[in-house]
């Protein structure tokens, strides 16, 4: 199979690659190797121009129905032409005349090997390819890209490293090899914003064919970019939509998939070769309907993302190509080498467009003295913002560990600094309106954020990062703050240096950084359920294997005790969030209850019917003792009395002191048990 991407098929980055139409005179002056490059045009031409086409006779000349209107006729017999008319682009025989393209149309039959194509066929493929606008050259202008993919506006000018000819060749060779690909690159080289667009281009040209050595039938499937959060789906799809010269989704090659998607974000005329931006959960529901699978933010180890990797690896023959993208492989390289079958590793060298300066602010308190450490950290933060201040009209991002700390640090900073203060995290509504204020303000803006801003939203005027170096890692019925990993540091640092030079101020000792094994602090039921659905062998088929396998097996026993069939579980997985696995017992009771419970999981609207149903599950928690936290909050120290984690201690906040027991409705809603 052809492994190298000829120059004429580069994606137009509008910097040193442009859309281009080649003339027959240019073809005549090419070397044999250059001419042979046009043989690969047969694949996109068959898919997008000759599919369902036929021969017509137009003004006495045989042509393809895509060239001219006319009555369908039987094709003429073809030998070697007696004359070539380069100006009219026609082959002339004693009895008839045929267009270059029609000649190629008749010669390019199933099982024809492309290395057998002669000059006569190649000239016709050149004409057909010109009509499709699939060729490129190092000369041209942006406006030449209008119409390449049906776009009304030109492609964006992209100087990033991932769209250089060298990177395009390397990525194409990996894509066409059908090996799993692990792609890394510094923040700012265009991994997420450009590589999916490049794979869309390759899929448009060559996707669906089992080989590029000869003509075969094709089975066209879209590309999917699977992402951990809805915010990322919306952000990256919009970026690529605009960069491909579209202003609306309908009729474009871009589609979105996530739960409760609004009508206006549904592409009602999607392209078979297009790219779907999807949340991980919805990616899993139709995983094998896609030809190329791209999984982004691999370093985050989102639970469903890791499951997709495991499923794709187990069933790799059902997917043409898999790309795993991450900023760094610091934590996962060795595991990926062992886990994936013959993986290809690609690194796109490069850095952010602008220089990033680093500043270390030492905290003299040991982190083991948690409260004292945080108080010193807050004092250091005020000093750092005073010393390293964003310019007027710009912003800085303060990374803290949790949503609660966002409010704590904002309150602290507001009392000591004269700048505009904002909070952005995953639970904040109308983030766009907050950003409008940030962008329109002539003042300095300071944005306090949980790790959400590592990747979910790009702040265009940010010049400074103030990184506390911690993250809250949830665990069943609790969680803990931990210092970040190297990959998380790279993500946070990379928020600056994209538009202007930036400054990264960090408040933690680098020796504190460590890899975070999220699977060791997660509910494991999804691993069990998806393993059943996709015939995974546990634990060896998991990308990341839990340290404590006892919990995995206890989870399996707990799920088996529900007495729900695998078929029903699969339907539940496809249709509902099931943030608590116990909800499955209710989803199977009645369609009406299932609809109300689903609405509760999506919107938080708790009806009396749903509350009573959940209370019937008896998800009981024993209150051991409590203490007063502030005016309207009491901390309750409790013990879980149900499920896999029966006996686990938990800390629950409530607006008044409680004794005895409470029932769990969700991870944030608890109902005291009446002691009477």
From Swiss-Prot:
Gene label: OPG084
GO CC terms, sorted: virion component
Quaternary context: Monomer.
Organism: Variola virus (isolate Human/India/Ind3/1967) (VARV)
Inducers of expression: Expressed both early and late in the viral replicative cycle.
Location relative to the cell: Virion
Molecular function (Gene Ontology), one example: ATP hydrolysis activity
Motif (DEXH box) on chain: 296-299
Presence of the UniProt keyword ATP-binding in the record: yes
Sequence positions that bind ATP: 185-192
Function: NTP-dependent helicase that catalyzes unidirectional unwinding of 3'tailed duplex RNAs and plays an important role during transcription of early mRNAs, presumably by preventing R-loop formation behind the elongating RNA polymerase. Might also play a role in the export of newly synthesized mRNA chains out of the core into the cytoplasm. Required for replication and propagation of viral particles.
Domain (Helicase ATP-binding) ranges: 172-347
Domain Helicase C-terminal: 366-542
Major subcellular site: virion
Sorted UniProt keywords: ATP-binding, Early protein, Helicase, Hydrolase, Late protein, Nucleotide-binding, Transcription, Virion
Family affiliation: Belongs to the DEAD box helicase family. DEAH subfamily.
Annotated EC: 3.6.4.13
Reactions catalysed according to its record: ATP + H2O = ADP + phosphate + H(+)
Protein name, per record: RNA helicase NPH-II
């Amino acid at each position: 199979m052809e492994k190298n991407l000829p120059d004429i098929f580069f994606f137009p980055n509008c910097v040193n690659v442009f859309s281009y139409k080649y003339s027959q005179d240019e073809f005549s002056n090419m070397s044999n190797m250059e001419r042979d490059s046009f043989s690969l045009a047969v694949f996109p031409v068959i898919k997008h121009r000759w599919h369902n086409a036929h021969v017509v006779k137009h003004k006495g000349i045989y042509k393809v129905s895509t060239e001219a209107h006319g009555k369908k006729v039987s094709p003429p017999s073809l030998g070697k032409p007696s004359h070539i008319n380069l100006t009219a682009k026609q082959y002339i025989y004693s009895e008839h005349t045929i267009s270059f393209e029609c000649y190629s149309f008749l010669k390019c039959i199933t099982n024809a090997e492309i290395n057998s194509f002669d000059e006569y066929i190649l000239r016709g493929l050149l004409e057909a390819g010109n009509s499709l606008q699939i060729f490129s050259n190092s000369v041209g202008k942006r406006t030449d890209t209008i119409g390449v993919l049906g776009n009304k506006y030109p492609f964006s000018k992209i100087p990033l490293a991932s769209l250089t000819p060298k990177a395009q060749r390397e990525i194409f060779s990996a894509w066409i090899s059908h090996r799993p690909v692990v792609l890394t690159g510094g923040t700012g080289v265009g991994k997420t914003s450009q590589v999916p667009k490049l794979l869309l281009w390759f899929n448009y040209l060559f996707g669906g064919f089992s080989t590029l050595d000869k003509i075969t039938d094709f089975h066209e499937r879209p590309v999917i970019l699977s992402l951990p959060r809805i915010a990322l789906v919306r952000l990256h799809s919009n970026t690529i939509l605009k960069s491909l010269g579209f202003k609306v989704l309908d009729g474009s090659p871009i589609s979105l998939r996530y739960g409760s998607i609004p009508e206006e974000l549904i592409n009602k005329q999607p392209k078979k070769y297009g790219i779907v931006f999807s949340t991980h959960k919805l990616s899993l529901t139709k995983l094998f309907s896609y030809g190329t699978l791209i999984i982004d933010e691999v370093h985050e180890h989102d639970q469903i993302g890791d499951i997709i990797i495991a499923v794709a690896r187990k069933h790799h023959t059902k997917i043409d190509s898999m790309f795993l993208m991450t900023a760094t492989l610091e934590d996962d390289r060795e595991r990926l080498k062992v886990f994936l079958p013959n993986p290809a590793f690609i690194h796109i060298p490069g850095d952010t467009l602008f220089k990033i300066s680093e500043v270390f602010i030492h905290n003299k308190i040991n982190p083991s003295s948690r409260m004292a450490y945080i108080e010193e950290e807050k004092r250091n933060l005020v000093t750092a913002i005073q010393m390293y201040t964003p310019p007027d009209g710009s912003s800085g991002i303060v990374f803290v560990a949790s949503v609660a700390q966002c409010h704590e640090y904002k309150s602290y900073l507001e009392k000591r600094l004269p700048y505009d203060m904002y909070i952005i995290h995953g639970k904040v509504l109308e983030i766009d309106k907050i950003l409008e204020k940030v962008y329109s303000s002539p003042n300095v803006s300071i944005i306090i954020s949980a790790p959400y801003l590592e990747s979910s939203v790009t702040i265009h005027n940010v010049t400074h990062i103030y990184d506390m170096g911690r993250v809250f890692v949830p665990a069943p019925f609790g969680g803990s703050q931990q210092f970040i990993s190297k990959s998380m540091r790279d993500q946070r640092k990379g928020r600056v240096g994209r538009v202007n030079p930036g400054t990264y101020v960090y408040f933690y000792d680098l020796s504190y950084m460590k890899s975070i094994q999220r699977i060791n602090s997660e509910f494991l039921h999804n691993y069990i359920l998806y393993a059943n659905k996709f015939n995974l062998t546990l634990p060896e088929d998991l990308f990341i294997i839990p340290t404590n396998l006892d919990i995995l097996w206890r989870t399996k026993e707990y799920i088996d005790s529900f007495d729900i069939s695998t078929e029903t579980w699969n339907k539940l997985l496809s249709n509902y969030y099931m943030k608590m696995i116990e909800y499955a017992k209710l989803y199977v009771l009645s369609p009406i209850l299932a609809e109300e419970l689903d609405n509760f999981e999506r919107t938080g609207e708790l009806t009396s019917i749903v509350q009573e149903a959940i209370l019937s599950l008896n998800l009981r928690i024993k209150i051991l003792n409590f203490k007063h936290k502030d005016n309207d909050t009491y901390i309750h120290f409790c013990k879980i009395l149900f499920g896999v984690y029966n006996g686990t201690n938990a800390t629950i906040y409530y607006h008044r002191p409680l004794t005895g027991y409470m029932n769990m409705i969700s991870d944030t809603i608890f109902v005291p048990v009446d002691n009477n």
